Amino acid sequence: MASLNSDVIMGESSSISVPSSSSKNSKRFELKKWSAVALWAWDIVVDNCAICRNHIMDLCIECLANQASATSEECTVAWGVCNHAFHFHCISRWLKTRQVCPLDVCEWEFQKYGH
């Protein structure tokens, strides 16, 4: 009876070709190059900041304006308990005048911020 590792197909015919012992040890294929591809996205429904309208993974308008300066900070994302996400700079500027979420007008409370 053929083992599970061989390429022999068991059928009703009387002639069965069994691979020789030398072909069992040879490689069936050799991997010479492997290029991995991966995609990711934020776990949010809307992927644009509703304040500056830039993509949430891109720089906010404040960071874009200060891009030439040597002290440009990292542009992070801030989530509220309502699960709306904004650039941290954008929501900080918004919260100086109103303490509510710009989208659902619920009282703003940080759930998390950073990448």
Curated annotation (Swiss-Prot):
Bias type Low complexity, positions: 13-24
Tissue-specific expression: Not detected in floral buds, stems and roots.
InterPro entries to which the protein is assigned, alphabetical: RING-box_E3_Ubiquitin_Ligase, Znf_RING, Znf_RING/FYVE/PHD, Znf_RING_H2
Protein name: RING-box protein 1b
Pathway where it operates: Protein modification; protein ubiquitination
Main location: cytoplasm
Keyword set includes Magnesium: no
Subunit details: Part of SCF complexes, which consist of a SKP1-related protein, a cullin, a RBX protein and a F-box protein.
Residues binding Zn(2+) 2: C60, C63, C75, H89
Function description: Component of the SCF (SKP1-CUL1-F-box protein) E3 ubiquitin ligase complex, which mediates the ubiquitination and subsequent proteasomal degradation of target proteins. The SCF complex plays a crucial role in regulating response to auxin and is essential for growth and development. Through the RING-type zinc finger, seems to recruit the E2 ubiquitination enzyme, to the complex and brings it into close proximity to the substrate.
Family, per entry: Belongs to the RING-box family.
Subcellular location: Cytoplasm; Nucleus
GO molecular function, one term: zinc ion binding
Matching Gene3D superfamilies: Zinc/RING finger domain, C3HC4 (zinc finger)
Organism from which the protein derives: Arabidopsis thaliana
Sequence positions that bind Zn(2+) 1: C49, C52, H87
CDD domains documented for this protein: mRING-H2-C3H2C2D_RBX1
